[in-house]
């Protein structure tokens, strides 16, 4: 089973990576840092856009772990952009059955902020027929989710 961790933090060694490490510990996985890719906003088309490269890597994975810091009361812009751009690009069954996990961390998030992120990722999974396993916001939750990975 192949696992892809998509790091939506601009910090490659930050808290999002550390929290994801609790979920991914002992597993073989590939990591994709969104900060390394040019992914333009929905509706913009440029020759150097690398969005489809990310989608192809997602297609190859059996399980996807999506990680984001909580910035300005929500998920990072790079993660939001990835989700937004997916609409109309992913064929109906391309992601069907893939497991999706969400790692979401911040300094002192409110329950409303966490619920909004969880809802958004859960709806994304539902739209594409993915098996949403849930969200981890701390080490204990990440280790519990790891049982399903």
Please provide the spans of the model-predicted regions:
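N-terminal beta1-alpha1-beta2 submodule of the flavodoxin-like/Rossmannoid cofactor-binding fold
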Residues: 1-91, 122, 126-133, 137-149
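Short, glycine-/small-residue-rich phosphate/pyrophosphate-handling segment
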Residues: 96-135
């Amino acid at each position: 089973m192949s696992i892809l961790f998509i790091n939506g933090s601009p910090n490659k060694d930050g808290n999002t990576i550390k929290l994801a490490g609790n979920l991914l510990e002992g597993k073989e996985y590939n990591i994709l840092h969104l900060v390394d890719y040019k992914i333009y906003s929905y509706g913009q088309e440029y020759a150097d856009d690398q969005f489809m490269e990310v989608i192809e890597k997602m297609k190859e994975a059996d399980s996807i772990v999506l990680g984001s810091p909580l910035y300005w009361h929500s998920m990072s812009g790079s993660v939001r952009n990835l989700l937004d751009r997916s609409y109309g690009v992913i064929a109906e069954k391309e992601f069907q059955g893939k497991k999706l996990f969400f790692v979401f961390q911040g300094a002192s998030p409110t329950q409303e902020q966490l619920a909004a992120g969880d809802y958004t990722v859960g709806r994304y999974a539902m739209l594409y027929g993915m098996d949403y396993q849930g969200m981890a916001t701390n080490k204990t939750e990440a280790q519990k989710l790891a049982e399903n990975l």
